[in-house]
Amino acid sequence: MSNNNYPPPPNPPNYQGEEQVHNVQPDLENNQEKYYAEQPQPSQQFEESFKIDKPKWNDWPFTVFFLLTVAGFIAIAGITLNALKKTYGLQGSSIYNSTDTFTLNTNTIILFGFIIVVGVVLSVLIIVYARMAPRVFITTGLILNIILGLGTCIYYFVAHYYSAAIVFLVFTLFTAWCYWSCRHRIPFSATVLEITIDVMKRYPSTLITSFIGIIVSGLFSTLFSVVIVATYVKYDPDSQGCDVAGGGCSQSKLIGVLVFVFFAGYYISEVIKNVIHITIAGIYGTWYYLSNSDQGEPKHPALGAFKRAMTYCFGSVCFGSLIVSIIQLIRSFVQILKQNAFGSGDNCAGCGFLILDFVLGFIDWIVRYFNHYAYCYVALYGKSYLKSARDTFDLIRFKGMDALINDCFINTSLNLYSMFVGYVVALLAYFYLKFTDPAYNSSGTFYAPVVAFSFLISGQITRIALTVISSGISTFFVALAKDPEVFQMTNRDRFDEIFRNYPQVLQKITSDH
């Protein structure tokens, strides 16, 4: 069908023989005024473009609950860190003795700079490669993933680790089957990847937002880890920290405090991650709906999206994050019980907990995946979490397989290339230490920590771009499923390309929850 048959915008495309609308009660025809009111309106102010229906403060009780959780975590951190500080000399100050102390001399400064520069350069090259040859990028990533899984399977068979070998063989065969049966969808995924990267280049604030999020998450993860150790120091009955002010010690108190610390840590981490996701989704939403409007797009979309995520929509963020945090906490307990069962020789109970852990892990993945799209609705339309969840259910009901395949293709490739960057930087760091031979590594004891540090840091650098691409892809898919006529009107050539590779773009989802 010729692409010249598009009707005049702003109506949806009307190709003969194509189903156009998935009507979800109430239907579009009876609610056009209210339906189109959901779309962001042109304005110079982000708050005016992305208006929120009353009540503006969505899901506010969960904001209160989150703030109480943060206050409790801060209180426990203050007590336990004080105990850790006062017993620091008894705990030991380093893994290594004084003769092996790792000092920041010129050599290490150059090494850190070298790691960061190489990681950034390789990450940029990967993005350039993905933009220039998206189909080859995705196909290569998927094939390499299959080869890597097959190689791991063969290694485990050679090592006579048959249980792991069979698991990897099953997953590798399943991955190969998915690739072969769904390979015709790669062109659509490639087009979406192109568009997402182009928007990322147009809005550098997406990368800045992700970078800030990585730093904040890293700092909190460090604090979280230290508080866990400090909790043992303060409340373990056999610890020297029992004599420090802040309450007595007992096994029950230790377990109770640890439960809260783990819950609070998971909860706060989830909230941080989702605030960043909503902020980036708001930037992509600005581009999708308003970049080509006559009045222009709002100024400072990143700041406006972040402000809304931290105010009107923060309760919705806390609501969805709470669900994931509870699942994570339960799964952590199950993993502890599993380890204790196997450690005590009770293999029957251990297998039961192993199966339960797998089920909880699958549920955790489903909820995270669901939340990822639900928060796109929160970012774009300012709805409460439950209303966004119902819209997400409609999206998954009608286009869930399309979204899942698209995400799997792109994310698998991105994660594989990210791991490649980590391997390359870690190898270069090893050669750097080997050939410069710094004094602190004269005995070779710092190869492992420096190489591990290089791998982690380079991976974090690459994750900055990956987080943006992942959020951008999901936001674009949500907006395209809900309002394809907007993209048809503002990006006609791109829309034609998407239609050729993905005719289901005409199957518009309309809902009013």
UniProtKB/Swiss-Prot annotation:
It is a multi-pass membrane protein. The chain crosses the membrane at residues 61-81, 109-129, 137-157, 164-182, 211-231, 252-272, 310-330, 347-367, 413-433, 461-481. GO terms for cellular component: plasma membrane. Residues 82-108, 158-163, 232-251, 331-346, 434-460 are extracellular. Keywords: Cell membrane, Glycoprotein, Membrane, Transmembrane, Transmembrane helix, Transport. Residues 1-13 have a biased composition (Pro residues). It is found in: Cell membrane. It comes from the Eukaryota. InterPro entries: Choline_transptr-like. Its main location: membrane. Belongs to the CTL (choline transporter-like) family. This is Protein PNS1. The gene is PNS1.
